[in-house]
Swiss-Prot record:
Pathway: Pyrimidine metabolism; CTP biosynthesis via salvage pathway; CTP from cytidine: step 1/3; Pyrimidine metabolism; UMP biosynthesis via salvage pathway; UMP from uridine: step 1/1. It holds the Pfam family PRK. Belongs to the uridine kinase family. This is Uridine kinase. CDD domains: UMPK (cd02023). InterPro entries: P-loop_NTPase, PRK/URK, Uridine_kinase, Uridine_kinase-like. It comes from Shewanella frigidimarina (strain NCIMB 400). It is an enzyme of class 2 (transferase).
C-alpha cells in the first residue's frame, strides 16, 4: 500500500463535543463501501504519555488538556508508518490508572484513518499529515454536561473531581489551545456529532480523495 492510498481525516474539538459520534458514524457507513479492514479510528487519548513512574497522586495532578500531556511525536510517527504501508502498535491508556497499560493494539495499514482528539489541530506535524481536518464547534456548556455524565458513568470519576478538573484545566486549556486551533480546520461542524449534512460532506470528501 502506498501513501496515496491512505487518507487521514482529523476530527478535533472540545471534550464531549461529538467527535467520537461523528467518527463512529463515518466509520460504520464507510465500512459498507470499503470493508471493515480498510478503515480505522485512532483516538488521540491513546497517546497520553506513560506515567507509570509517577505516584497516583502525581498522575491525578497532570494537566491532561495541555498539548505537552500527549506524545504527538509518536502519533505522527505512527501515521507516517501507516501511510508507508507499515503496521503500528498503538498504546492503550487507562483512564482509571491515569497511565498507559502494557497492552498495545496492532493496526494494519488502511485506506482511511480517522483521528479524533481535542488537541490534534494544535500540532503542525499532525496537521501536515491530514488530508482533511474537522473542528466540532459545540457550545462549551453542552460539552461540560456531556463530559460530566460520561466521566462519572464510564470512567470511574466522581462528580466533584470532574467539576474540579473542568474549572482547573479543561475550560482554561480549551480557551488557550483548542478553540484557537479551529482556524486550521477545513470543515467546522456546529450542533455536534448528529449533524447529518456535515457527515455527508465529510464522507463525500473522503470518497473524492480515495478516487484520486
Amino acid at each position: 500500500m502506498n501513501s496515496q492510498q491512505c487518507v487521514i481525516i482529523g476530527i478535533a474539538g472540545a471534550s464531549a463535543s461529538g467527535k467520537s459520534l461523528i467518527a463512529k458514524t463515518i466509520f460504520e457507513e464507510l465500512c459498507r463501501d470499503l470493508g471493515t479492514n480498510q478503515i480505522g479510528v485512532i483516538n488521540e487519548d491513546a497517546y497520553y504519555h506513560d506515567q507509570s513512574h509517577l505516584t497516583m497522586e502525581d498522575r491525578v495532578k497532570t494537566n491532561y488538556d495541555h498539548p505537552k500531556a500527549l506524545d504527538h511525536q509518536l502519533l505522527a510517527s505512527h501515521l507516517t508508518q501507516l501511510k508507508q504501508g507499515e503496521p503500528v502498535s498503538i498504546p492503550c491508556y487507562s483512564y482509571t490508572e491515569h497511565t498507559r497499560i502494557s497492552d498495545t493494539l496492532t493496526m494494519q495499514p488502511k485506506k482511511v484513518i480517522i483521528l479524533e482528539g481535542i488537541l490534534l489541530l494544535t500540532n503542525p506535524k499532525l496537521r501536515d499529515l491530514m488530508d482533511a481536518s474537522v473542528f466540532m464547534d459545540t457550545p462549551l456548556d453542552i460539552c461540560f454536561l456531556r463530559r460530566l455524565t460520561r466521566d462519572v458513568a464510564e470512567r470511574g470519576r466522581t462528580m466533584e473531581s470532574v467539576i474540579s478538573q473542568y474549572k482547573r484545566t479543561v475550560r482554561p486549556m480549551f480557551l488557550q489551545f483548542i478553540e484557537p486551533s479551529k482556524q486550521y480546520a477545513d470543515i467546522i461542524v456546529p450542533r455536534g456529532g448528529k449533524n447529518r449534512i456535515a457527515t455527508d460532506i465529510l464522507k463525500a470528501r473522503i470518497q473524492h480523495l480515495l478516487a484520486k
